[in-house]
UniProtKB/Swiss-Prot annotation:
Cell location: Cytoplasm
Pfam annotation, one family: tRNA_anti_2
Known role: Bidirectionally degrades single-stranded DNA into large acid-insoluble oligonucleotides, which are then degraded further into small acid-soluble oligonucleotides.
Assigned EC number: 3.1.11.6
Intrachain S-S bonds: none
Catalyzed reaction equations: Exonucleolytic cleavage in either 5'- to 3'- or 3'- to 5'-direction to yield nucleoside 5'-phosphates
Gene Ontology molecular function: exodeoxyribonuclease VII activity; nucleic acid binding
Complex and partners: Heterooligomer composed of large and small subunits.
Protein name as it appears in the record: Exodeoxyribonuclease 7 large subunit
Organism: Anaplasma marginale (strain St. Maries)
InterPro entries: Exonuc_VII_L (IPR003753), Exonuc_VII_lsu_C (IPR020579), OB-fold_nuc-bd_dom (IPR025824)
Chief place of localization: cytoplasm
């Protein structure tokens, strides 16, 4: 109906407030429970706890709000394609969707979004093996981040009890819904800030749909996991389920119970391994001692043989010494005999010897020995020496 086809008297008149209230009532009565499919954008989380966002498709955008206290199975994240359940309301002359429920839509797009995020973080080096921390050999204290109720925590505690009893600290969190990833982040930070932190952390939840596991694809959670000073083992879902936290964690376990088996050795197996290693150590020590003993015996044999050789050399040296002394004495005796003979010969030509046997020695007046008659002339004075005295004489002819 156009304005020209009706009488102005027939057009109802409203105040601004009246028409606003009427539109609000019409929208509430008509769209009191609807589903809207769209992509989340413009996400805002003020301190009030309310969540403000927009839902968009290729052509249009609608504002939406989720009041603080509304429990959802999926957390808000820009880029997610979701189906929101709620009702339309007006606010400041505009209408908006009040969200009361939300599920993920378009799993193909979710998978593409997840792969894009994984590649981004991988390119940053967040998943590098060099960043991974080794697990302790035998942790005395284990931190577990999971729901305080349900099968997962029971399975973990039961497996710990039967495998190797250890001190378990449970940090209770939601493992599904819009608050899950933030609670897990706070739990990891909380464990790292304890004065006596656990030796290792297990982050666990049971299996579920991609929507159920989506909180563990959160980028902030991945960064917090990689930055943890305490080694983290992720155990999210079943063996075929992979989430971003699995790449960021130091070790990924296929199931929560498998995480316990990775973290803790089996008690009996540990005892057996220790006994086996002790046996190997004893055997190695025996082998080393045996080899050293054999070497000592060899050295003792060498020393004994050397001692015998030294004794033989000593005896030989003594024999040579005695022989040398004997030869020296013989040589000395011969020299003594030769010397005595020489002295005897010299003595025979000695003046005193000659005189003693009846000969005399003649000297001229200068005291020189006269050995020839031609050495003196008539009237020369000479001195004649006998053994018992001297006499002066003159040469007559």
């Amino acid at each position: 109906m156009s304005l020209r086809s009706c009488s102005t008297e027939m057009i109802p008149e409203f105040t601004v407030t009246e028409i606003t209230d009427l539109v609000r009532q019409v929208m509430h009565d008509t769209f009191y429970c609807i589903k809207i499919r769209g992509e989340i954008s413009g996400l805002s989380r003020p301190s009030s706890g309310h969540v403000y966002l927009s839902l968009k498709d290729d052509n249009s955008v609608i504002s939406a709000v989720c009041w603080n206290g509304t429990r959802l199975d999926v957390q808000f994240e820009n880029g997610l394609e979701v189906i929101c359940t709620g009702h339309l309301s007006t606010y400041q002359s505009r209408y908006q969707l009040v969200i009361e429920g939300m599920v993920l839509a378009g799993q193909g797009k979710l998978a593409a979004m997840l792969e894009e995020r994984r590649k981004k973080l991988e390119k940053e080096g967040l998943f590098d093996q060099a960043r991974k921390k080794p697990l302790p050999l035998l942790p005395l204290k284990i931190g577990v981040i999971t729901s305080p109720t349900g099968a997962v925590i029971r399975d973990i505690l039961n497996r710990v009890k039967h495998r190797f009893p250890s001190h378990i600290i449970v940090w209770p969190v939601q493992v599904q819904g819009s608050q899950a990833s933030a609670m897990v982040v706070q739990a990891i930070l909380g464990f790292n800030n304890l004065e006596e932190p656990p030796d290792v952390i297990i982050v666990a939840r049971g299996g579920g749909s991609i929507e159920d596991l989506w909180p563990f694809n959160d980028e902030e959670l991945a960064r917090t996991t990689a930055a943890s000073k305490i080694p983290i083992v992720s155990a999210i879902g079943h063996e075929t389920d992979f989430t971003i936290i699995d790449y960021a964690a130091d070790v990924r376990a296929p199931t929560p119970t498998a995480a316990v088996e990775i973290v803790l050795p089996e008690r009996q197996q540990l005892v057996s391994d220790i006994a086996h290693k002790l046996s190997k150590i004893r055997s190695a020590v025996r082998n080393v001692l045996g080899a050293k003993e054999h070497r000592l015996l060899q050295l003792y044999g060498v020393l004994t043989e050397t001692k015998h050789k030294i004794s033989e050399v000593g005896r030989s040296a003594l024999a040579h010494q005695e022989k040398i002394e004997f030869l020296f004495k013989v040589a000395l005796l011969k020299k003594q005999q030769y010397l005595d003979n020489l002295i005897g010969r010299i003595d025979r030509y000695n003046k005193e010897h000659i005189i003693s046997v009846g000969y005399a020695v003649i000297y001229d007046n200068t005291g020189q020995h006269v050995s020839s008659a031609n050495a003196v002339a008539p009237d020369d004075t000479i001195v004649i020496e006998w053994k018992d005295g001297k006499r002066r004489a003159a040469i007559l002819t």
